[in-house]
């Protein structure tokens, strides 16, 4: 996997593996291959609340076969005319650990792991931790959706009750208008009766 300022470049095989493990949903990871075939992961940054760096997918490239070492020449037979020659010193084997006069950490001493690198175990623990965080967030979202549904039901019920109150108020208003009309008619009748009584009681 290579990285530049614009995007990550990964193969289809790596992309499928990252999709299966949901890695690209949580954080950007750079895979570093060692000479002995082991892989270490470098966590670049979390992208939960940050924009993700785009990923460019390329075709898988077959690994080039390692060159074969030339066979050693056969040793000549031992005899008086051909005394045994001492074996030539073996060439030092290449190791992942740096050595030499400029490096005091040569030999079998294990180099300390830099802080920016993590082992596969630490990587899996980090991935599991993020999955747990996602699960908690999903549970909270589900609870919020339930609350929103209940609020929607309450609002709908209140809306229906308001409609019923409006209908009831309209009916009461019409009833009051009828009562007022009836009272007005009764007042008119009383006025007419009072006028008649005044005429009767007045002297001729």
Curated annotation (Swiss-Prot):
Organism superkingdom: Bacteria
UniProt region (Disordered), positions on chain: 46-132
UniProt biased composition (Pro residues): 64-80
Biased composition (Basic and acidic residues): 117-132
Similarity comment text for this entry: Belongs to the UPF0134 family.
Name the UniProt record assigns to this protein: UPF0134 protein MPN_655
């Amino acid at each position: 996997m290579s990285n530049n300022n614009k995007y990550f470049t990964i193969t289809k095989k790596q992309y499928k593996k990252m999709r299966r493990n949901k890695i690209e949903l949580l954080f950007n990871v750079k895979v570093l291959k060692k000479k002995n075939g082991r892989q270490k992961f470098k966590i670049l940054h979390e992208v939960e609340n940050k924009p993700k760096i785009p990923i460019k997918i390329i075709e898988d490239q077959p690994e080039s076969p390692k060159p074969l070492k030339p066979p050693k020449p056969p040793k000549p037979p031992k005899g008086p005319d051909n005394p045994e020659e001492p074996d030539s010193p073996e060439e030092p084997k290449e190791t992942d650990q740096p050595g030499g006069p400029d490096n005091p950490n040569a030999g079998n001493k294990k180099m300390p792991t830099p802080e920016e690198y993590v082992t596969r175990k630490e990587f899996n623990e980090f991935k599991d931790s993020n999955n747990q965080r996602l699960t908690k967030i999903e549970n909270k979202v589900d609870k919020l959706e339930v609350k929103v549904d209940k609020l929607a039901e309450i609002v709908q019920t209140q809306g229906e009750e308001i409609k019923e109150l409006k209908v009831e108020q309209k009916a009461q208003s019409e009833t009051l208008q009828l009562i007022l009309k009836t009272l007005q008619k009764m007042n008119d009748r009383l006025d007419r009766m009072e006028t008649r009584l005044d005429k009767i009681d007045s002297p001729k």
